[in-house]
């Protein structure tokens, strides 16, 4: 009986954590940067905020290559605000070697990501990757 109770509790915990996953979590394909390179950013919860790590890089020809930024956290401190809005984060742009104040907006399978300096923003639309 004790084993059944523990198994049920473990299954319930697993289901609850899966149900609480943030909608922006997962793999996202970026648009090409200024150098023509694109990538896959894997977004996950880092505490109570979202962060994203570069997990794959492709050159302008679409070939996978070993980027010096592989495994680097590209997005961090994104605060979920509800209704697909994420604010008060930071984003690193490898093509410019700069970090910007950032925001994200999720709509279906598209994630609009913007990095800003003062009131000037540069944005991309990322699409959900398999």
Put a short name on every predicted segment.
Residues 44-49, 105-111:
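Short, solvent-exposed coil/turn segments at beta-strand boundaries
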Residues 17-21:
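Sec/Tat signal peptide C-region and signal peptidase I cleavage site
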Residues 1-7:
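Positively charged n-region of N-terminal signal peptides that target proteins for export
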Residues 94, 101-104, 110-123:
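Short, exposed beta-strand-loop hairpins at the edges of beta-sheets
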Residues 24-25, 29-100:
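Central antiparallel beta-sheet cores of small beta-barrel/beta-sandwich binding domains
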Residues 7-15:
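Bacterial N-terminal signal peptides
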Residues 129-130:
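Short, solvent-exposed mixed-charge patches
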């Amino acid at each position: 009986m004790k084993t059944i109770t523990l198994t049920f509790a473990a299954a319930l915990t697993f289901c609850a954590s899966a149900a609480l996953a943030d909608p922006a979590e997962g793999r996202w394909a970026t648009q090409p940067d200024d150098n023509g390179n694109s990538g896959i950013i894997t977004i996950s919860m880092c505490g109570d905020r979202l962060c994203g790590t570069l997990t794959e890089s492709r050159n302008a020809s679409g070939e996978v290559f070993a980027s010096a930024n592989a495994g680097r956290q590209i997005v961090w401190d994104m605060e979920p605000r509800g209704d697909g809005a994420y604010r008060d984060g930071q984003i690193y742009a490898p093509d410019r070697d700069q970090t910007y104040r950032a925001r994200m907006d999720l709509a279906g399978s598209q994630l609009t990501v913007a990095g800003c300096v003062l009131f000037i923003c540069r944005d991309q639309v990322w699409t959900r990757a398999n």
